[in-house]
Amino acid sequence: MKISIVTVTYNASTTLEATMLSVFNQTYSCVEYIIIDGGSTDDTINIIGKYADKLSYWVSEPDKGIYDAMNKALKIVTGDFLIFMGADDLFYNNDVIQNVVSQISDIDAVYYGSVLFKGIGTKHLGKFNKIKWATTNISHQAIFYPRIIYTTHSYNTQYKIYADYAYNLNLLKDKVNFVYVDEIITLYNMTGMSANTLDETFQKDYRSLLFKSVGVSAYYIGKCIRCLYFLKESLKKKYL
């Protein structure tokens, strides 16, 4: 079984090499590694070139954002399953791919695990149900998409930050099977783009996407949970 790993980069010279090494150090050998760079102007290209002989493919050219670059990758990868690894994220250990592959029994299902926040040590997010889907997304650095999915679905580039969330919600709407594996997949850097940025277009469509994917009840329960969370955080900042 071949696993495709894709890293999308832009001016990531301070973090990319560590990410690449975490891929190369995987004990599972049937891997293709692809880097899609958006025309970096720092030392990123030199770092990619340093390891070019270990890459299945790489390119550096202007793009229209991270999801445009990810869509480019969807047309190139050839693996049975695909995972996107951020240019500032790391596989949790050298056996991650091997551990996940050993648990794959349905080649048409989406497999996902958890991530661990760098510097905090908090595990995120465990197994999902409809209500959890209504409150948050699975980190795309923890998802393995099968060929039947990544060859037939692309990212909506109108969503600048949360196209991966919309992607997953649309898969749920289409009754795609998501299978949880009890593994930490990635050390996730919370300073990345989606960790600190809003997506106004996505927010406008959020309710509709959830109604169609998880249902009205789960949406409103999730909304209550989010409101309570933000109230708790606000009170902590005010009184602690």
Q: Which sequence ranges carry the predicted segments?
A:
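Conserved nucleotide-sugar donor-binding catalytic segment
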Residues: 120-205
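Glycine-rich, basic loop-to-helix element that forms the pyrophosphate-binding segment
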Residues: 60-77
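Short aromatic/hydrophobic "clamp" motif used to bind/position activated sugar donors
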Residues: 82
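Acidic helix N-cap motif at the loop->helix transition within catalytic regions
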Residues: 14-17, 42-50
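A conserved acidic beta->alpha catalytic loop
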Residues: 37-46, 86
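Conserved donor NDP-sugar-binding/catalytic core segment of glycosyltransferases
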Residues: 90, 94-124
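Short, acidic, metal-binding catalytic loop of nucleotide-sugar glycosyltransferases
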Residues: 21-30
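Short beta-strand/loop segment that forms part of the nucleotide-sugar
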Residues: 30-39, 59-60
